[in-house]
């Protein structure tokens, strides 16, 4: 067999196996990007050597075979898939083909490419009759009873202006919130977790017991009309218009659908929704672009398996395969020993990734991952890269278990894992150089003492050269001593000493936050300062007293009590006060001054007249909780210049939105 023919045969067999796992088992073994690469290679070879194209090639059909355990339904007309484009150049070429065939620039309808399971739903005389999966495009699986359980799908159409028979085509998805809840239930039971919402939606839809499907909180969005009878029934003459008709009949249609008149508008839509991707309630992997006018769709027609008038404009891959080459153990500010996977560098989500946290021993056990494994790495938006699965069939014979060290890799102190906690910790405290470095970085950080010029590299050098051992030592530094540091001349050293002096004037809340007590963030520190008002009162408090403070539960109270019971911590606090750190007295706040008590506020965009931290502190002083994200519980969003996805979400949820001028008026 010629080498090319052999490669085509091997690629066909491999892709068919991946198709079966993806469409039938709902258990994909490789990322979408890897599948696309294999498929594109096969397409290229078949184009060059059509005589070797096999009848079972995945390029000759759509999707996978119907499951035998469900009844099979022949579609009223084929459910085809879409061709893909992966960048602006490829989309421009797609548009040019449209222009060449029609002789004119056409408008487009754009919508999110939902990452779920395509289904066909038939209504007869306005009543839900049956539903089927796409299957192989010609025949699908009868999932009528399962789809009937999806609450967003109407069992009867609204109004009376719908055709006697109408087929609705769309995507069944699992919203992020439902996916997280499903996996949390599985985690509690010790069951296997779903890798992503797409797998969860597909697995839920193919349950033989529809009660299980009903418990999974699936969603649905229509993306097209299928067969309509009689064919003479008057429908909108544009794709966008037909989606609006579906919406008027009570069928869910995504609010993200947009009409675009030009290629520039399509590109703007693509980049906008890509930026907002992580804030959407559902998973998407690109944008579907369709010629808007139905007459032009009909004239453009179809190729063998896809319409000429539509394409899927895919986002850069968020998942890739790579090799786990080793594991390093890092020690953080609170002594947490974190396993970090060293990866063979891989480009994913727009960046090259060479490391990924494994979090803790429980996560390693859940993944079943070993050194030497081929793993799937995921990076969505600005989210930290994470390992989501192991490709078990690629495991080498010499793969090694990941074993936590018995002693700290930095200071050799014993490590311990407290019962009920997932984290393993070094017991060395400030004796541990790693913990000292992280503690002092935190102490000097912008939200703590805010020492201008005291960056991470400066702190690391101060520790390495034994100029500083605790935060209190910062206030004994001299300019001449700091000239020992790399790239630190006398002028820079003098400036840094002056910044340290300025940092002595702070607030009680910032001081408490700077101490780095476990679980004590900015908001908790502010609540503690407001409640106790003085350092002496705080030091004298018991765990029972701490629990009386807003947002302080038993765990945080225990951490506070433990921290303040350690002689070396009290010694550091005393030395800091002796060094001259001070703050204005915390004044009693009258109840009438807490005008925002119980409210949740969010800040977004750039504030031009207020420092963001000052605005946050002033809102908290009025009793507000300042959150980092918008939800249905948000009372007000302050939108500065260039506000982004938070503003969009607030508008969708009907949250009150004000500008910076209105905020200043409230705070004055």
UniProtKB/Swiss-Prot annotation:
GO terms for cellular component: cytosol. The keyword Flavoprotein does not apply. Pfam families: BRCT, DNA_ligase_aden, DNA_ligase_OB, DNA_ligase_ZBD, HHH_2, HHH_5, Nlig-Ia. Keywords: DNA damage, DNA repair, DNA replication, Ligase, Magnesium, Manganese, Metal-binding, NAD, Zinc. GO terms for biological process: DNA repair; DNA replication. PROSITE patterns: BRCT, DNA_LIGASE_N1, DNA_LIGASE_N2. Belongs to the NAD-dependent DNA ligase family. LigA subfamily. NCBIfam families: dnlj, PRK07956.1. DNA ligase that catalyzes the formation of phosphodiester linkages between 5'-phosphoryl and 3'-hydroxyl groups in double-stranded DNA using NAD as a coenzyme and as the energy source for the reaction. It is essential for DNA replication and repair of damaged DNA. This is DNA ligase.
